[in-house]
């Protein structure tokens, strides 16, 4: 269990390696810092960067960046206050976003199963999620989409359970639409969620 708290990978100044990691981080950074999708004014391109018309153009979908952007915004605020930090707070707090979404994924699954009167075990849910490989992506490859995708599916599940059990459904229909939008923007292969 203690291996999950390995923190040395968070001690980087900027995420610029590994194509997918760089792409998802690029989306989060540009959304949080200046609210546009112009990547040229935030990032130093790496050898794996993709370009369109001479401009940085990340290939990954923007959904995980949209979910992680508030964390980068908070980290950027800390960076502007504590300017002498060796490790940027935006990286540290960004790396925690996947852990927080993993916890909320477990919580939404737990809450949904409680609403269905199934007596879930929260520890078992946490162990199932981390044992499925999500732990690796939450702790080690925190900018990848896997945890954000699990969160969006758990949010869809929770929304459907609430819609089926509540008389006042309007807010949960909105939550379902939002969670479907997030699921599709995190990874387009989630279109199968629309079919069900």
Task: List each language-model region with its residue ranges.
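Transmembrane-helix signature of polytopic, membrane-embedded enzymes
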Residues: 80-91, 104-132, 151, 165-175
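Membrane-interface alpha helices of multi-pass inner-membrane proteins
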Residues: 28, 125, 172-188, 194-195
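Hydrophobic transmembrane alpha-helices
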Residues: 72, 76, 106-114, 132, ...
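Short, hydrophobic secondary-structure boundary micro-motifs
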Residues: 39-42, 136-139, 194
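Transmembrane signal-anchor helices characteristic of membrane glycosylation enzymes that use polyprenol
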Residues: 1-18, 26-29, 36, 132-134, ...
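Short acidic/glycine- and proline-prone juxtamembrane loop motifs at membrane-interface regions
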Residues: 140-148
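Short hydrophobic/aromatic helix or loop-helix immediately within or flanking a transmembrane segment
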Residues: 29, 45-85, 147
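Membrane-embedded alpha-helical segments of multi-pass membrane proteins
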Residues: 19-20, 62-66, 92-104, 147-155, ...
């Amino acid at each position: 269990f203690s291996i999950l708290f390995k923190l040395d990978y968070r001690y980087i100044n900027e995420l610029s390696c590994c194509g997918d990691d760089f792409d998802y981080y690029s989306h989060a950074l540009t959304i949080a810092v200046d609210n546009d999708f112009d990547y040229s004014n935030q990032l130093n391109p790496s050898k794996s960067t993709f370009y369109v018309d001479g401009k940085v153009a990340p290939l990954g979908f923007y959904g995980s960046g949209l979910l992680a952007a508030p964390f980068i915004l908070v980290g950027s605020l800390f960076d502007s206050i504590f300017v002498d930090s060796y490790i940027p707070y935006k990286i540290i707090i960004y790396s925690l976003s996947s852990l927080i979404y993993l916890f909320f994924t477990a919580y939404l699954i737990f809450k949904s199963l409680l609403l269905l009167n199934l007596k879930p075990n929260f520890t078992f849910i946490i162990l199932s999620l981390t044992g499925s490989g999500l732990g690796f992506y939450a702790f080690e490859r925190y900018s990848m989409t896997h945890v954000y995708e699990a969160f969006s599916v758990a949010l869809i599940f929770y929304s459907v359970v609430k819609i089926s059990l509540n008389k006042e459904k309007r807010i949960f229909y909105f939550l379902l639409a939002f969670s479907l939008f997030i699921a599709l923007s995190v990874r387009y292969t989630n279109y199968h969620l629309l079919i069900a």
